[in-house]
Amino acid sequence: MGLRTVLASQVLPALEAVDRSGNRLDNRLLPSCFSYGAPASNERLPEDLLCALWDEAASLSGEPDFGLRAGEQFMSARSFGITGMLAWHSKTAGAALTNASRYAALVIDGSHLNFEHDGQVVSILGSDDPRPKYWSRHYGEAKKQAFLSLLRRSTGLPLVPHLVEFRHAPGMDVPCTSKFSAAG
């Protein structure tokens, strides 16, 4: 199977958060698409490089919860490309999840979000892509936090996370699962 790529815009929140902390990522670490500011909206990076850039940004910031903060403050619908814009303009959380699931592969090659709901609880399950995804901690946390924030802002619902699990390293048998519900 080929190398998995992601939208280059997925690294911009990490760069903004590092800049805001008074540090700068070494330009030699950045791919050429960042030479003149933000990359084109369709520019792609190898997933491993994206995770390495997020890890380096977190290291420079010195924050243990860098990914959560960057996901909340700096990721937007635009960070997720057309997928985020479709989710943002959905009228319901269900429509937003359906759109995000349908177009997830535009953000990360091979991605397809599976989700289930049971009354007020929605479970977002990992992709059915056979290639395992072990994101860096900070990138994984930023994506989950940003997606939750995007759903909250686009629907106006007070969504509350119940359970979030990540696979951080090979050999760990933990499913990528998120559960949240609308409080109230």
Predicted region positions:
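N-terminal low-complexity or simple alpha-helical regulatory segments
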Residues: 1-123
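Alpha-helical bundle regulatory/interaction domains
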Residues: 90-184
